């Protein structure tokens, strides 16, 4: 598998994603940013239940609350637009990681999102080290941060 397989995704803008002006509603950019990194780890080979807690089975003992997020809109994103979503994750320290998402339409960057997550124990809420699987995904992704496919 090539890094582009899990780092460059597609998103089609739907009617329900947009506001009355016909452009995406602002909160959807952060939603799409989060969904993109979730999809990316699954394509990479990490089952989502290994990362995100399922309270019925309690497989994961780690939670990743968002401690910072930003969205920048550089051009209108409208109904029917087909976007490439380029994911660029990196580790900040032992318990923090950041995922940048770049939204590209017709070869031009039209928006970007940034989400920073903190790794916490689900019960104590103490900061803990990022899980090995997530670290491997970040490392494998950073080997190819210069993807030219976009």
Curated annotation (Swiss-Prot):
A Pfam entry, by short name: 4HBT_2
GO molecular function: 1,4-dihydroxy-2-naphthoyl-CoA thioesterase activity
EC number: 3.1.2.28
Active-site feature positions: 19
Catalysis performed (reactions): 1,4-dihydroxy-2-naphthoyl-CoA + H2O = 1,4-dihydroxy-2-naphthoate + CoA + H(+)
A GO biological process held by the record: phylloquinone biosynthetic process
Enzyme class: hydrolase
Listed pathway(s): Cofactor biosynthesis; phylloquinone biosynthesis; Quinol/quinone metabolism; 1,4-dihydroxy-2-naphthoate biosynthesis; 1,4-dihydroxy-2-naphthoate from chorismate: step 7/7
Keywords: Hydrolase
HAMAP family: DHNA_CoA_hydrolase (MF_02101)
Free-text function comment from the UniProt entry: Catalyzes the hydrolysis of 1,4-dihydroxy-2-naphthoyl-CoA (DHNA-CoA) to 1,4-dihydroxy-2-naphthoate (DHNA), a reaction involved in phylloquinone (vitamin K1) biosynthesis.
Protein family: Belongs to the 4-hydroxybenzoyl-CoA thioesterase family. DHNA-CoA hydrolase subfamily.
Protein name: 1,4-dihydroxy-2-naphthoyl-CoA hydrolase
UniProt organism field: Prochlorococcus marinus (strain AS9601)
């Amino acid at each position: 598998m090539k890094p582009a397989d899990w780092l460059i995704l597609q998103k089609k803008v739907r009617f329900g994603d947009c506001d009355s002006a016909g452009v995406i509603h602002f909160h959807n950019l952060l939603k799409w940013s989060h969904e993109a990194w979730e999809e990316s780890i699954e394509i990479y080979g990490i089952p989502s239940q290994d990362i995100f807690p399922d309270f019925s089975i309690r497989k994961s003992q780690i939670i990743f609350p968002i401690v910072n997020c930003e969205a920048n809109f550089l051009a209108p994103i409208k109904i029917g637009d087909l976007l490439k979503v380029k994911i660029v994750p990196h580790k900040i320290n032992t318990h923090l990681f950041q995922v940048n998402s770049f939204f590209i339409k017709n070869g031009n960057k039209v928006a970007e999102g940034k989400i920073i997550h903190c790794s916490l124990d689900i019960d104590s809420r103490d900061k803990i080290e990022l899980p090995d699987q997530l670290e491997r995904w970040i490392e494998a992704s950073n080997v190819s941060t210069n993807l030219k496919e976009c």
